Amino acid sequence: MKIQNPALIRAVGVAGAFLVRRLVGTTEFHFRYADPTVNPEVARRTGARYIYAFYHEVLLFPAYFWAWPEMQILISDHRDGELIAQTVLRLGFGVVRGSTTRGGARALREMTGRVDRGHLCITPDGPKGPRRHVHQGLPYLALRTGLPIVGLGMAFSNPWRAKSWDKFAVPRPYGKATCVFPEPVIVPPDAGREVLEECRAEVERRMRKATDEAEEWVAKL
């Protein structure tokens, strides 16, 4: 059943944020960096800005660990996205509604306008997939903003999986989680369509490699 009542949606967001803090808060987190300066904690101190990209299925990882007001995240403007938006807003994220595909121009303009507030966060395979595919809007956003793209690989240990297009991961209590940061991808300021596609493919390649590494790592912990 679809929830349409705005007050009920807000209430679900409050409850969702509480559950995320309680559930994901029991997780033991591990991080690996190809370049330590892209660590959001370090960038927060130095004032550096990045576009952080992570797959839709592992949204609960950054939703808990990096829920800061300077993290501006793009959430789908589909009806289902409203519940996610209300939840991450109450966790502490800055929220932009839209996607890099459907209605993408408006969302990209608004994300570009948020650069002075902090980092930009994207689930590049959202809102409807294909799973672990990077859409073209991500390198275009990097072109517009001049920010490097850091495509993260994340994994939970033996998570519950939703029967959805992305196999959304819900961590089990007191489990472990890993995050691998590859080198950032920098989109040239004069990039045309062909170069943008090359950058898109490179981000996707690095994200898949980092995800494989994160999944292999968490299985050994």
Region annotations inferred by a language model:
Residues T27-F31, V95, C179:
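Generic structural signal for residues in well-ordered beta-strands
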Residues E41-R44, T101-R106, S164:
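Short acidic (Asp/Glu) patches
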Residues R21-R49, Y55-F61:
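A short, well-structured juxtamembrane/interface segment
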Residues M1-V24, P69, Q86, R90, ...:
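Non-catalytic C-terminal accessory region of glycerolipid acyltransferases
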Residues A48-R102, R161:
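Catalytic core of membrane glycerolipid acyltransferases/transacylases, capturing the structured
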Residues V42-G47, F65-W68, R114-D116:
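Flexible, charged surface loops at secondary-structure boundaries
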Residues T37-P40, A63, A85, L138-P139:
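Short amphipathic alpha-helical segments and helix-helix/interface helices
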